A protein has these predicted regions:
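Secretory targeting signals
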Residues: 1-17, 42-113, 153-178
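Transmembrane helix boundary and interhelical loop/hinge segments in multi-pass membrane proteins
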Residues: 13-34, 38-39, 46
């Protein structure tokens, strides 16, 4: 999974750079002259980047799965079938991880006009479960189940059903969708109000 995590961090940083370089190179005004509808412009830009991110996630997850199976097989570890529900859940969750991080990076870069600030905000979102762990037991469980990272890990099956932050996979997908929709909504609203 380390390779997948590295690929996800790279795609998140690339999403931030994908947005912020237009500001630095002053090509944003030209792009908006060609596509005056700002919401459509952002949606098209996000779709292009998501296609690339899905491809990168697919390659990194397949590569990590095959390399992991090869290494563990050489060590004599008995491995479950790739078609087993647990493995499919893990691979599916890992496939969602890259595009979800890319959308967070993209939305934060649009909202905050700064690549560094966008990275820090996404990093803060990723660290929220650690902050939630400071809360008392039941409150921690409740808050953690609404956070982005525990939802991703629940979707991938890496949190035990009785673990802190666990959300059933279908509900976890909903939590991820809410985070993405809210952050993208904030980004579109912010972008439409900007004086460029």
């Amino acid at each position: 999974m380390m390779g997948v995590d590295i690929a996800n961090i790279i795609t998140m940083v690339l999403a931030i750079l994908f947005v912020s370089t237009e500001r630095v190179t002053n090509t944003l005004q030209l792009s908006l002259q060609l596509t005056p509808n700002r919401a459509r412009y952002l949606a098209a830009k996000l779709c292009v980047f998501l296609l690339v991110t899905v491809g990168v996630s697919l390659v990194s997850v397949c590569f990590a799965a095959l390399c992991g199976r090869w290494v563990l097989g050489m060590m004599g570890v008995e491995l479950p079938s790739l078609a087993s529900p647990e493995v499919l859940q893990l691979l599916g969750g890992l496939l969602v991880l890259g595009p979800a991080h890319a959308v967070l990076g993209f939305a934060c870069a649009v909202t905050f006009h700064s690549g560094l600030l966008a990275f820090l905000v996404v990093f803060f979102i990723m660290c929220l479960p650690s902050l939630a762990s400071l809360l008392p037991g039941d409150l921690e469980r409740g808050v953690s189940s609404l956070l982005f990272m525990p939802a991703i890990h629940s979707l991938a099956g890496t949190i035990a059903p009785d673990g802190v932050g666990y959300t059933p996979p279908a509900l976890a997908l909903g939590v991820i969708a809410v985070w993405v929709v809210v952050l993208c909504g904030i980004a579109v609203t912010s972008f439409q109000r900007q004086d460029l």
